Design a protein with these regions (language model features):
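Conserved cytochrome P450 K-helix/beta-meander segment immediately N-terminal to the heme-binding cysteine loop
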Residues: 28, 298-325, 333
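Cytochrome P450 heme-thiolate "Cys pocket" and heme-binding signature region
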Residues: 314, 320-391
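Cytochrome P450 catalytic-core helices
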Residues: 209-214, 220-248, 342-369
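Cytochrome P450 substrate-recognition site 1
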Residues: 1-68, 132-144
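Cytochrome P450 heme-thiolate monooxygenase catalytic core
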Residues: 71-225
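Conserved cytochrome P450 K-helix E-x-x-R motif and the immediately C-terminal K′/meander segment
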Residues: 249-287
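Short, mixed-charge aromatic SLiMs
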Residues: 130-147, 250-259, 321-324, 380-389
């Protein structure tokens, strides 16, 4: 196995597509304990492994059933997109086009689904704005290994945000669901808080707060990054292949879904290196790994493996296909027992006949003739990897 390039992660790593997949699927490799982020995510799903992980995941799978996915898309996402784009007509700027910060606009859209998924009862505009304030500090904790900020200060801000999120929004909704369970059961659509509030869950308040914080940042962060990257990459592709713009707008075509998957391969919205710790003596890629040792799955390298993507793998090309048969075309949602539970929200689910948040929102931007705004600068997050926090665009206003 090779050695990791970033100094902060000098651990053995796998880099080939096949070996990364095997590492992620290995049952004896658990997510590396993240001591720095423990106050914020220590007992959340992403930190669990083995029986505890399986039990938590089984209980939360109902949140991503076909019926639930259809409800999120039809009852929440679609009207939210219509209302958000219609509201742009009220902006006192160019009468034909509106200036939009793409990541912020998308985050506000996705936040509507996140609130329903978690089960937050207060959903007014002022409430959403307040919840929005918690997102960046919590994301910083989730990315703490790659942050260029002071980690102690970042974790302190995240812990404060999580505490306020719990006190102001989560705890009242959680107590209401606990009371409902005591009085005969929760009869409204399942949400995360109703699952955690079940007497059978064994969840304490701290764990409930951490799980809700995870769901907030995971649902918002992954989707926002994916959509921003897809809009940028598809815009460049359509400049070179103008006929494909019609395919982007065609909801009966799978072209846009392939664009989303290719964007996920070219620009993974996750950490470029997924760290695992051996829970027992194991073998990865034919190399022995001692219990307690740390190994890494280099997702970025795997996505550029010439054995799978021989033709300019760094280039965005939604028409490409892997050169060999593979289980999945990228590892941006992981693989194996820790495959992202919320993946169907982002890329859709054939069982539910949903196309996913990413394709739906990207199509809405192209239907509004999205264009990069060169008059305003782009800005990146304070991390060692590229993530937009400002990506200015303009869109046509529907009158």
């Amino acid at each position: 196995m090779d050695t990791v390039v970033p100094d902060l992660m000098k651990v053995p790593q796998e880099t080939s597509f096949d070996d990364v997949g095997r590492l992620l699927r290995a049952r004896d490799l658990a997510p590396l304990p993240r001591d720095a982020a423990r106050p914020v995510l220590g007992n959340a799903l992403v930190s669990l492994h083995g029986a505890a992980h399986r039990q938590r995941r089984i209980s939360e799978n109902k949140l991503f059933s076909p019926d639930a996915l259809r409800r999120y898309e039809e009852d929440i996402l679609e009207p939210s997109v219509r209302e958000a784009f219609a509201a742009l007509s009220a902006l006192p700027e160019d009468p034909e086009r509106a200036a939009v910060n793409l990541p912020a606009f998308v985050t506000e859209l996705i936040l509507n689904i996140s609130i329903a998924l978690i089960g937050i009862d207060r959903r007014g505009e002022a409430d959403r704005k307040r919840i929005y304030e918690f997102i960046d500090p919590l994301i910083a904790a989730h990315e703490i290994e790659w942050s260029t900020e002071d980690s102690t200060a970042a974790i302190a801000r995240a812990a404060d945000a999580q505490s306020r999120f719990w006190t102001e929004f989560l705890e009242p909704a959680y107590r209401r669901r606990q009371a409902a369970h005591r009085e005969g059961g929760w009869t409204e659509p399942a949400d995360l808080l109703s699952v955690l509030a079940s007497p059978d869950s064994g969840i304490d308040d701290d764990t409930a707060a951490q799980e809700c914080a995870l769901y907030l940042i995971a649902s918002v962060f992954t989707t926002t990054s994916t959509i921003t990257n897809t809009v940028e990459l598809v815009s460049g592709w359509c400049e070179e292949h103008p006929a494909d713009r019609d395919l982007v707008l065609d909801s009966s075509s799978d072209f846009l879904s392939r664009c989303v998957e290719e964007a996920l391969r070219v620009r993974p919205p996750i950490k470029p290196l997924l760290l695992r710790q051996a829970t027992a003596d194991a073998s990865v890629g034919g190399c022995p790994v001692s219990a307690g040792a740390t190994v890494g799955a280099n997702v970025a390298a795997a996505h550029a493996d010439p054995a799978v993507y021989p033709d300019r793998p760094e280039k965005f090309d939604p028409t490409r296909a892997p050169a060999v048969q593979v289980r999945r075309t990228h590892y941006s949602f992981g693989d194996g027992p820790h495959l992202c539970i919320g993946r169907p929200l982002v890329v859709g689910d054939p069982r539910a006949e949903t196309e996913g948040d990413a394709a739906h929102i990207v199509r809405a931007f192209f239907a509004a003739d999205v264009r990069t705004d060169p008059s305003r600068p782009r800005r990146f997050a304070s991390t060692a990897r590229k993530r937009y926090i400002d990506y200015p665009v303009t869109v046509r206003i529907a009158r």
